[in-house]
Regions:
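Beta-strand-rich domains and repeat architectures in extracellular enzymes and scaffolds
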Residues: 32-65
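Conserved beta-propeller blade signature
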Residues: 55-57, 100, 174-177, 185, ...
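C-terminal tail/sorting-segment detector
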Residues: 499-523
Length: 523
């Protein structure tokens, strides 16, 4: 039987990418409050959330980042006890002045490395002050929960391991969280207490209010537990709660504060593509409401990954983008954006799709070396409106539908006194794992120029034999830049493992300067 803990890795590989991408060679620049530092926390961004008049929040594998000026500058938060959880940020949700975040880190266990809930945090004042909330756990004796006047049997979740909050949804009254083994919970007192919410079993399509619940709410694999009790995504508004699990899409209608009536849609009783539901979103346009879900194959051989959608409240379903692994959604009136493993798709009718090319920044001479687009948001607060994306290799925004991009990444400066004048990252570099685009990995050799110049990159092996010589590149303005290398020699053959030396030559105003740095290649 397939274990459902492992599909989560596809999202948390973002944090692994961070280890190679967002390392720091020097102490980051502290801000006045000593709780934040300048720049992005990491280059792997899984969620972008807009708040207030100008704030953008970024969930990265290295922590929480914020821009208060539409990307002109960024600050990031140190993990601080009683304030910000450690590790990567697995989810963000904002409502008015309130923002919630959740953290994740890896724990080493007997069966390997497993994602672990690092807890949550909230701010009531747009992120100025934060309160930490421990990852919700149960006492070993908490085997029952009062629900709809009945005592419902729950398996106590006593560890944060596999109890990771992957999604948060806010209403004026509740914060809802989906925490995989921790199930679906909600709080009406800012995390001082949590209420566990029962969902239908794998064998049931409906769970009515007033119905006696005879099974245990248990996230273990069948036959001991139910895949439908593993919560991965949640979306709440009004009296409606949508929950995505490892066994389908659950539509809940709150009939009272103590009961939610559930109807479950899965690949066996409806036309959704698969039962593992990793993302959900609601599009409202011109009086029409469409519900979107990224649905992956779970256990049945008849399931497949695609985007599932319903425009009649779940009564009927259809699929689109068959074969695509979805991550997230964004909307701009009638326009739909779908973030996938293949890149960012756009549609004006929800049926016919265009795929964006990978983002390139002609001003900074940067490319996002990642097909994976994990998140997107359309921000109309800044004229004329921008589309933001988050990838495994950085974030970017465009105001002209992808013709021009501005790319933002975190790396150590090469122009500050005491910092290296040139360096390679990631280092060590794996051409088969790092920054994969069009089948090639990429390493960047970062440097700065004081003005207009021509630069040329050359790579030598340990015996100082030339293996690669790049074309001369013309740079028109002072600044920091990076030359990419795909780990191949001049004949197009991937180089062997070993130590290599990178030579960067700068020609400016008739003078030539040469800089060297060392690079280790490990496939």
């Amino acid at each position: 039987m397939k274990k459902f803990i492992y599909p989560i890795l596809s999202l948390l590989l973002v944090a692994s990418a961070l280890n190679a991408q967002a390392f720091r060679l020097s102490k980051p620049s502290l801000t006045a409050d000593n709780r934040t530092y300048s720049g992005l926390a990491g280059n792997a961004a899984t969620q972008i959330e807009a708040q207030g008049d100008s704030i953008l929040w970024f969930a990265t594998g290295g922590g929480l980042s914020r821009s208060s000026d539409f990307g002109q500058s960024f600050v990031s938060y140190y993990p601080i006890p009683d304030s910000i959880p450690k590790g990567g940020i697995s989810s963000i949700a904002a409502l008015d002045s309130i923002i919630w975040i959740a953290g994740v880190f890896d724990s080493t266990t007997k069966i390997g490395s497993i994602q672990t809930g690092a807890g949550l945090a909230f701010s009531k004042d747009f992120g100025r002050n934060w309160t930490y909330v421990k990852q919700p756990l149960d006492s070993a004796s908490a085997t029952y929960e009062k629900w709809d006047g009945d005592n419902v049997k729950f398996l106590p979740v006593v560890t944060p391991v596999s109890n990771t909050t992957w999604d948060i949804s806010l209403t004026p009254k509740y914060v809802y969280i989906a925490s995989w083994a921790g199930g679906i919970r909600r709080s009406s007192d800012f995390g001082a207490s949590w209420q566990r919410i029962p969902l239908p079993s794998d064998d049931d399509d409906v769970l009515e209010c007033g119905e006696k619940i005879t099974f245990q709410i248990n996230p273990n694999d069948p036959p001991k537990g139910n895949h439908n009790h593993k919560g991965f995504s949640v979306l709440a508004y009004g009296d409606t709660v949508w929950v995505g699990t490892a066994n389908g899409i659950n539509l809940g209608i709150a009939e009272s504060d103590s009961c939610i009536r559930w109807r479950k849609y899965d690949a066996q009783n409806s036309a959704i593509s698969g039962n593992f539901v990793v993302a959900m979103a609601r599009q409202v346009w011109n009086g029409k409401e469409t519900f979107w879900a990224a649905t992956l194959s779970a256990e049945s051989s008849s399931e497949y990954q695609a985007i599932s959608k319903s425009s009649d409240g779940g009564l009927t379903w259809s699929t689109t983008l068959s074969g695509e692994r979805g991550y997230n959604f964004a909307f701009d009136d009638s326009i739909v954006y779908v973030c996938t493993e293949s890149g960012l798709f756009k549609s004006i009718d929800g049926e016919n799709w265009a795929l964006y090319d990978p983002a390139e920044d002609s001003v900074r001479r940067e490319t996002l070396y990642s097909h994976n687009v994990y998140t997107a948001v359309v921000d109309q607060r800044e004229f004329p409106g921008y589309l933001w994306i988050g990838t495994a290799d950085g974030i970017a925004k465009t105001r002209d539908d992808g013709i021009h991009w501005s790319i933002y990444r975190q790396s150590v400066s090469t122009k500050t006194k005491g910092d290296p004048q040139i360096y390679a990252f990631p280092n060590p570099f794996s051409p088969t794992h790092h920054n994969i685009l069009n089948g090639d990995g990429h390493v960047r050799i970062k440097y700065h120029v004081d003005g207009a110049a021509q630069v040329q990159l050359e790579i030598y092996d340990f015996a100082m034999r030339a293996v690669y010589k790049g074309d001369k590149q013309s740079i028109t303005a002072a600044g920091e830049y990076a030359e990419p290398w795909n780990g191949r020699n001049s004949d197009g053959t991937q180089v062997a493992n070993g130590t290599y030396f990178c030579k960067l030559t700068q020609e400016s105003r008739g003078k030539e300067k040469t800089y060297w740095t060392k690079l280790i290649v490990v496939k």
